[in-house]
């Protein structure tokens, strides 16, 4: 397996349509953008429509997120992709990685604004490389549910992905995230439970509290004088 570590910064996407979560995390500056799909919209009580996408796009940009990803839907993916493209320049279009999706990506001719999604195989990553799309989204936890060699498949995907960026999705725990990051994967779609917790540390919280308590205490004048003089 190639070691991709340090070839580019860590890119983290917030994988939810919950705008309250967007607002809570916007000022951290940790997230490259937002990823969504029809299931995530449904879980947030939203209809999947171009109108909804337009509203979410405006909200995301108002909060300072650099980009947002919307997935094609309906019976005419090309027409839907063109409508998503027209929402604005910060939109990335998610297209399922099957034969129909490859055709849509080719006709759209905007590889820098495409994510091929629902990726489970090395062959799908090869197709993404051939199409030179910006992102390819393999589903980690779902693949682990389906096969015993998911980690081996992911390592091969990483070796194949020379130009397209693997945007790792379907994560169920912070441990899964940390394990993949330690192996050189550097672009992730983080669901809300992980996005709000991965950077936290109870030990860090204790240390920060100790610093603040020390800052508020009256210093021992004798000890302070001794340290200054010595």
Name these PLM-found stretches:
Residues 7-8, 13, 18-22, 28-30, ...:
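Active-site beta->alpha loop and helix N-cap motifs at the rims of alpha/beta catalytic domains
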Residues 37, 93, 128, 180, ...:
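Conserved, mostly hydrophobic/aromatic
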Residues 45-55, 75-80, 94-110, 120-127, ...:
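Active-site-adjacent beta->alpha loops and helix N-cap segments on the catalytic face
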Residues 38-41, 134-145, 185-204:
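Glycine-rich phosphate-binding active-site loops on the catalytic face of alpha/beta enzymes
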Residues 29-33, 86-91, 107-115, 130-137, ...:
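Glycine-enriched alpha-helix->loop->beta-strand junction motifs that scaffold or abut catalytic
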Residues 13-15, 67-75, 89-99, 112-126, ...:
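Catalytic beta/alpha-barrel core
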Residues 152-156, 197-230:
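C-terminal helical cap(s) of enzyme catalytic domains, especially alpha/beta-barrels
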Residues 20-28, 79-83, 104, 121-131, ...:
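Catalytic cores of alpha/beta
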């Amino acid at each position: 397996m190639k070691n991709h570590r340090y070839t580019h910064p860590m890119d983290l996407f917030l994988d939810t349509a919950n705008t309250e979560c967007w607002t809570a995390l916007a000022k951290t500056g940790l997230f490259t953008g937002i990823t969504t799909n029809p299931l995530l919209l449904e879980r947030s009580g939203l209809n999947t429509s171009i109108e909804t996408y337009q509203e979410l796009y405006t909200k995301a940009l108002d909060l300072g997120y650099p980009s947002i990803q919307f997935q094609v839907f309906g019976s005419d993916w090309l027409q839907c992709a063109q409508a998503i493209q027209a929402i604005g320049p910060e939109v990335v279009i998610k297209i399922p990685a099957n034969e129909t999706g490859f055709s849509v990506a080719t006709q759209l001719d905007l590889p820098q604004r495409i994510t091929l999604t629902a990726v489970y195989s090395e062959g799908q990553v090869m197709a993404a490389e051939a199409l030179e799309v910006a992102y390819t989204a393999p589903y980690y936890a779902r693949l682990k549910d389906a096969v015993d060699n998911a980690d081996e498949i992911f390592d091969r995907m990483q070796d194949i992905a020379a130009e397209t960026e693997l945007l790792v999705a379907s994560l169920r725990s912070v441990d899964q995230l940390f394990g993949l990051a330690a192996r050189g994967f550097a672009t992730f779609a983080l669901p809300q439970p992980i996005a709000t917790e991965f950077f936290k540390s109870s030990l860090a919280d204790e240390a920060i509290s100790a610093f603040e308590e020390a800052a508020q205490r009256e210093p021992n004048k004798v000890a302070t004088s001794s340290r200054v003089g010595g």
